[in-house]
């Protein structure tokens, strides 16, 4: 039976945005954090999606909004407690996402031992590219990601540098929560995260696959 909702527009109906933190060793070092023994997980709401053409919004409560460039895995069917060996059978495709982060707020949350919700889960905190079918990326661990702010290269990394592989992450997450068709998993960011401000232009891409562009705005409320 054909899907009633197109995966090519997963951001319009997908329920869950699962994010993996500290999955590149170089980013762990730049954040002066300890390397994790298991994936570090947090969630964003579906209202965090900002498809290309819409702006990145700066929350009123932060003075230090950062970009984090990430490969996202788009789930193609319901996934519960799957093995690492079978995990890729549940993948429909990929996208490029930004995990926009209120870094000053996150730092305070860390100091107080609080969740990162205020720092990570605000409206438009997950800018997203077009959907890329699985067939167009035969090896998701052999990609080069890049990000520029106002034409200046900020982030450049290879997915081969992930600490936890995509099959491992899918299996791990699926044993904690059921993943549904249209859900995505953000797989972590390489080094080079940094601040953006109102009127900046963010460009990002996967070499040889796609690129995307966003304007940073401050909402009028």
Swiss-Prot record:
The modification N6-acetyllysine is found at residue 110. The keyword Magnesium applies. The modification N6-succinyllysine is found at residue 112. One of its GO terms (molecular function) is acylpyruvate hydrolase activity. InterPro entries: Fumarylacetoacetase-like_C (IPR011234), Fumarylacetoacetase_C_sf (IPR036663). The modification Phosphoserine is found at residue 37. Mg(2+) binds at residues 68, 70, 99. Residues 1-24 form a transit peptide. Tautomerase that converts enol-oxaloacetate, a strong inhibitor of succinate dehydrogenase, to the physiological keto form of oxaloacetate. It is thereby required to maximize aerobic respiration efficiency by preventing succinate dehydrogenase inhibition. Also acts as a weak oxaloacetate decarboxylase (ODx), catalyzing the decarboxylation of oxaloacetate (OAA) to pyruvate and CO(2), and as such is likely a regulatory enzyme in the TCA cycle. Also displays acylpyruvase activity, being able to hydrolyze acetylpyruvate and fumarylpyruvate in vitro. This is Oxaloacetate tautomerase FAHD1, mitochondrial. It comes from Bos taurus (Bovine).
């Amino acid at each position: 039976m054909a899907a009633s909702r197109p995966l090519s527009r997963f951001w319009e109906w997908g329920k869950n945005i699962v994010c993996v933190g500290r999955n590149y060793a170089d980013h762990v070092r730049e954040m002066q954090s300890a390397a994790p023994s298991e994936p570090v997980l947090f969630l964003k709401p579906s209202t965090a999606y900002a498809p290309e053409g819409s702006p990145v919004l700066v929350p009123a409560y932060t003075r230090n909004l950062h970009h984090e460039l990430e490969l996202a895995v788009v789930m193609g069917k319901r996934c519960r407690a799957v093995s690492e060996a079978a995990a890729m059978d549940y993948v429909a495709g990929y996208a490029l996402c930004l995990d926009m982060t209120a870094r000053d707020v996150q730092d305070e949350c860390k100091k107080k031992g609080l969740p990162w919700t205020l720092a990570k889960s605000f409206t438009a905190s997950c800018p997203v590219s077009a959907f890329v079918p699985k067939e167009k990326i035969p090896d998701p661990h052999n990609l080069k990601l890049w990000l520029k702010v106002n034409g200046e290269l900020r982030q450049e990394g290879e997915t081969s540098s992930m600490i936890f592989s995509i099959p491992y992450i899918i299996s791990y997450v699926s044993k904690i929560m059921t993943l549904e068709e249209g859900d995505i998993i953000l797989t972590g960011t390489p080094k080079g995260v940094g601040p953006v401000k109102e009127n900046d232009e963010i460009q990002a891409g996967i070499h040889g696959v796609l690129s995307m562009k966003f304007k940073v705005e401050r909402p009028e409320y």
